[in-house]
Every structure is written in C-alpha cells, then in structure tokens.
Amino acid sequence: MAKGTFERTKPHVNVGTIGHVDHGKTTLTAAITFTAAASDPTIEKLAYDQIDKAPEEKARGITINTAHVEYNTPTRHYSHVDCPGHADYVKNMITGAAQMDGAILVVSSADGPMPQTREHILLARQVGVPYIVVFMNKVDMVDDEELLELVEMEVRELLSKYEFPGDDLPVIKGSALQALEALQANPKTARGEDKWVDRIWELLDAVDSYIPTPERATDKTFLMPVEDVFTITGRGTVATGRVERGVVKVQDEVEIIGLRDTKKTTVTGIEMHRKLLDSGMAGDNVGVLLRGVARDDVERGQVLAKPGSIKPHTKFEASVYVLSKDEGGRHSAFFGGYRPQFYFRTTDVTGVVELPEGVEMVMPGDNITFVVELIKPIAMEEGLRFAIREGGRTVGAGVVAKVLE
C-alpha cells in the first residue's frame, strides 16, 4: 500500500552501494536511513535485517534480489539500492534493473580493496555508472593513521585504473556501525552531536555535491522503439510504441533506424488513447503518423529518433551475465561462434559471439566481456541493454560496453 503521496519538490537522484562482501554496504545503507530520518520524520528507518532480506524482482527475465530505500537530504530526494549477494550486483548492474546516477563504493579500512571491490568498479565502468564516491568504513578498527592513508591510496589508484578520476573524487572515512549504534541509542541525534553520525552527513554532502542531477528523460533527444505498425486508410502509416526519451512534435523530422537502410520522414500526426496530440513525451504510449512511408518501410525492432542522434551498428563489445542452470539458463557451456538471438528493445536479432583471447568457453553463471556481430544493424549506443535468448528463452543479459562498427 502506498505510504502517502510522493512530493516531487526536490530533484530525484538514483544511487546505490557497491563493494566487497562484508565491507559494510548494508550497514551503511541502514545508517544513512537513520541519519536522514533524525531530521526528517517522513523517512522510513530500515534496520540491517530489513534491508538484507531483499525481495526478489524480475528484470529481463532474470530474478534479482534488491533492496530499495529512499531518503532526503536538504537539497535532494534519493532512491538507493543495496543488493545482498555479489551475483545480485552483477545482474542488477548489467540488466539496468536499478539504474544508478552514481555509486557509493564501500571499502573496509581494515582490509583494503578486495576482489569484488575491483569487480564492482570494473562493472560500474562497463555499464556506465558515471560517478563514484568512496566511503572507507570500519576506521574505528584501525589505529594506525598511516594504514588508513595507504588504503585510501590503493582505492584511488584502483579507481584511476578503471578510468574514474581517482585523484579527485571524494573519499569519506567513517564507521557505519558506530553511527548506526549512536542513532539506535538516540534516534534524534542531530548533526554535530556525534562524530560518527557526522561522518555519514559528510558522505551525504559529498553525494549531494559530487553526483550531478541527471538530465531528465524529456530533455534528452527523441527516441521511440517501434512496437507495432499499421495503416490508416487515406492517412498513411502509423508506428506505435512508448517514447523512451525526449519529445516528438507534429512536423518534426525523424529517422527510422535499424534492420535496414536509415530513412528520413516527417511526423504528420501523433495520437494517444485515440486522441490527437501536438506532441508525445518520454513515457507516453503513442501512435506516430509518418509522411510518405509505406506499411513495409517500417517494422517492429526499428526506432524513430531525432535525425543524427543515434546510428545503426552491427558489431560491439558487450558485458554479459550468463544465467545459471538454476535460474533457467543453459545447462552447458558455450564456445566462440555461438549464435543466439540478441533481444534489443522490441525485437530479436541473431548474432555471432567472439570470445576474448585465452577464453575457451563460457559457463552458465559467468560474468564475461565478449564481442558480438549481428546479422542486421540495430540503433545502438553505449549503455544499451539487451537479453540473450535461445528459442524465446532468456539465457543471459548484457549491456553494450563499446560500439565497434
């Protein structure tokens, strides 16, 4: 049941915690909700165990456990995701189930960067998480100031290695557990009353100032995946679909892109729920009437887009999660030359997989980067999500990490 109405007064930003298992991501998430709730009674405080038993959700046919919490700072409203298991992170980031405008990388000061720290940073780079803020957790367990400096240096170097601005991004040191315990003892702990709670505020300040407010979907260039096509006698051809981003107006020029040669046309009408409109915007399900376009010139799987804003491509590097047998995926490995269907937006296109040097095969449950060559072009850009299917069954999920040709 909805808990009150959503007040859209502050800009909305999506964030999440990433980092190695047991470094304190979930404890930090709990501490943030308690910290924000101390000054804003509308925020729901969530204890560790409430976040940890995250509900299952499905994205692109894949089951993922994700906890969603929300909180406000004086300037913004945040949606924050936290995943219980490493596999959930991989799946979440690749499917884009929880799009992040920025991430909080949690590193235990007692252990320094660990294998999943590296993996999550690489994933963030591959799937296009644009900003990272670091929270060095458990500093109360480290007595040696030099050791803390060493860990900070290591984390910064690791981030730079994966093309994040490691030297410049904010690193906040604190203890999520100490802050949470202080807030559980006194839920009204305000800023300036406890040094550990203040570190959480410092983190929130860094997230507020370092992660920019994302561009709204309506401000981006127009794109609409075509779901269906039909003819209106005497008026012409209508393409229907949900506008993914931007705005389209009557008399706009648009390109029809993908699957065949790009064609330019003019929008002569827009309708929604059988009513005529002047424009359609991100989120609207519309029918777009196209001038001089025959019924056979446009098909499901193409996109309508602002001319020059997106190009058709066939070859790309993909970051992929392959479903395990238990998740309904393949029961056996696949090899180079594997030819499944790649489901982009509204249609399947066959493609051939080329594995990286030194990789013989890919097992169910693997997270891997490989090159795909499609038999037909698709309107494509970095960050585009897709499913991998065999005979209509999802066997993997991926994201375009790099467009090649």
Curated annotation (Swiss-Prot):
Stored Pfam families: GTP_EFTU, GTP_EFTU_D2, GTP_EFTU_D3
The protein's enzyme class: hydrolase
Q: Where does GTP bind?
A: 19-26, 82-86, 137-140
Please name the Gene3D superfamilies in this protein's record: P-loop containing nucleotide triphosphate hydrolases, Translation factors
Q: Which InterPro entries match?
A: EF-Tu_GTP-bd (IPR041709), EF-Tu_GTPase (IPR050055), EFTu-like_2 (IPR004161), EFTU_2 (IPR033720), G_TR_CS (IPR031157), P-loop_NTPase (IPR027417), Small_GTP-bd (IPR005225), T_Tr_GTP-bd_dom (IPR000795)
Its main subcellular localisation, reduced to a broad class, is cytoplasm
- Annotated tr-type G domain ranges read 10-215
Region span, G2: 61-65
Record region (G4): 137-140
Choose one Gene Ontology CC annotation of this protein and give it.
cytosol
Gene Ontology molecular function terms on file: GTP binding; GTPase activity; translation elongation factor activity
Residues the entry annotates as binding Mg(2+): T26
| Ranges where the record places region G5 | 175-177
Q: Where in the cell is it found?
A: Cytoplasm
Q: Which UniProt keywords apply?
A: Cytoplasm, Elongation factor, GTP-binding, Hydrolase, Magnesium, Metal-binding, Nucleotide-binding, Protein biosynthesis
Q: Which domain of life is it from?
A: Bacteria
What are the start and end residues of every segment in region (G3)?
82-85
Region labeled G1 — which residues? 19-26
Instruction: Check the record and name the NCBIfam families matching this protein.
Output: EF-Tu, PRK00049.1, PRK12735.1, PRK12736.1, small_GTP
* Family, per entry: Belongs to the TRAFAC class translation factor GTPase superfamily. Classic translation factor GTPase family. EF-Tu/EF-1A subfamily.
User: Which proteins does it associate with, and in what oligomeric form?
Assistant: Monomer.
* Listed HAMAP family: EF_Tu_B (MF_00118_B)
Q: Which protein are we looking at?
A: Elongation factor Tu
What species is given as this protein's source?
Answer: Deinonema sp
Lineage summary: Bacteria, Deinonema
